[in-house]
Amino acid sequence: MNRAFCLLARSRRFPRVPSAGAVLSGEAATLPRCAPNVVRMASQNSFRIEYDTFGELKVPTDKYYGAQTVRSTMNFKIGGATERMPIPVIKAFGILKRAAAEVNQEYGLDPKIASAIMKAADEVAEGKLNDHFPLVVWQTGSGTQTNMNVNEVISNRAIEMLGGELGSKKPVHPNDHVNKSQSSNDTFPTAMHIAAALEVHQVLLPGLQKLHDALSAKSKEFAQVIKIGRTHTQDAVPLTLGQEFSGYVQQVQYAMERIKAAMPRIYELAAGGTAVGTGLNTRIGFAEKVAAKVAALTGLPFVTAPNKFEALAAHDALVELSGAMNTTACSLMKIANDIRFLGSGPRSGLGELILPENEPGSSIMPGKVNPTQCEAMTMVAAQVMGNHVAVTVGGSNGHFELNVFKPMMIKNVLHSARLLGDASVSFTENCVVGIQANTERINKLMNESLMLVTALNPHIGYDKAAKIAKTAHKNGSTLKETAIELGYLTAEQFDEWVKPKDMLGPK
């Protein structure tokens, strides 16, 4: 039979039938009109025929997506598999489509169809159908192709559940049923917000909390370790190592607070705005009901956006969230840099901290160990800063009633949230919890510091104190020796007035 089909195809100059892999990579072609039995034979091999408004397309028989998804793979061969739409967006779409089906059933959608849509949407939300979403981020700026990818997958999976034929659009139509009362223009931004909120709550905030708690524990552990401070990378007056770490604790605390402060706008959903924000082709109450369903499904306080025109045309909420993550990246860059510099050495650096040794550090220098967790964290911070630039550009390009940088924006927001959350956990578990204070080195550096002379200001004045420091530095002598030689004070006075433990706060 296969040979007969090949001969028939050759005699009628039919195009070569691509494999499923070729279709996925974009090598799909339209099939000329031919006898039904020929189409059936083709379907029994590696593909089936589906239609969109532009015509017929070959769809791999083992995939639930349809013609519009295949056409997108043909038109947007950009980046390959590594640039696919983030899975959190796909899962968020599953949540949204289930919620919409529930509400549509309340408004009269056939319960049998609604139930099948809900079951298929649940599979999408649970990640069971991830292999059926091949589209890349770099597509239409509204995310229309991905919305249709979701509609097609849910439609065909629902059809299969109901015993129908894949690609027939019966009894479950991707547009008329799965996308009922919806537009890509309001569903994609809704999925963006759902995905961002879930990533923040499941990955980012838990990671930052773990880091915060570990730094807080170290701050308490190092509360009695007095060390020399540094400003402008030069010696300054003393503080405790615990005080130094308390600054890091507060930075991470503020980071979490900034992120949480941005979330109320993320919880506002565009669903119900349809094409331009007017809500055309929806029912009164649809938007509110969908938001309530999404809130129930996720356990997060989602509400309908008070102004759908803003929700479709601007994504300031995502720019705001990205900005909070950008600030977090700045904080983590500073913390990681401080820790790796304080741990520099082991013999030729500052050496005040002893960092965990996790792996060999050099392919040529035996015994070398590097602050790799600090380096990973700083690279993550740099990437997040770059992501924020892209999100900012995207957010500023909402034209009239629609922002058309949606896929790029959510890709970068999710990337930042995931990186910061994961890096915080890695940095905590593989570095922070194992940090030790090198008290011998800390005491040596503090006792040699010329800035202890600052304690003499109230007793002998700034000018004399400065002369003591400069003379001691020039002669290589100690502050005490120099102060006595200059006749500014006695040994007893120096010992009474220059006590690092008395220089740690106001009197």
Curated annotation (Swiss-Prot):
Record-level Gene Ontology MF annotations: fumarate hydratase activity
PTM annotation (Phosphoserine): residues: 363
EC number: 4.2.1.2
Residues annotated with Phosphothreonine modification: 82, 233
Signal sequence extent: none
Modified residues (N6-acetyllysine): 58, 63, 77, 91, 112, 119, 210, 220, 289, 499
Transit peptide start and end: 1-41
PROSITE patterns membership: FUMARATE_LYASES
Modified residue annotations for N6-succinyllysine: 58, 63, 77, 112, 119, 220, 289, 464, 470
Keyword Transit peptide tagged: yes
Active site: 232 (proton donor/acceptor), 362
Pathway(s) per entry: Carbohydrate metabolism; tricarboxylic acid cycle; (S)-malate from fumarate: step 1/1
Positions bearing the site annotation: Important for catalytic activity: 375
GO biological process terms held by the UniProt record: arginine metabolic process; DNA damage response; DNA repair; fumarate metabolic process; homeostasis of number of cells within a tissue; malate metabolic process; positive regulation of cold-induced thermogenesis; positive regulation of double-strand break repair via nonhomologous end joining
Disulfide bonds: none
Keywords: Acetylation, Chromosome, Cytoplasm, DNA damage, DNA repair, Lyase, Mitochondrion, Nucleus, Phosphoprotein, Transit peptide, Tricarboxylic acid cycle
Subunit details: Homotetramer. Interacts with H2AZ1.
Annotated function: Catalyzes the reversible stereospecific interconversion of fumarate to L-malate. Experiments in other species have demonstrated that specific isoforms of this protein act in defined pathways and favor one direction over the other.
Note: There are 2 substrate-binding sites: the catalytic A site, and the non-catalytic B site that may play a role in the transfer of substrate or product between the active site and the solvent. Alternatively, the B site may bind allosteric effectors.
Similarity comment: Belongs to the class-II fumarase/aspartase family. Fumarase subfamily.
Name the record gives this protein: Fumarate hydratase, mitochondrial
Organism: Rattus norvegicus
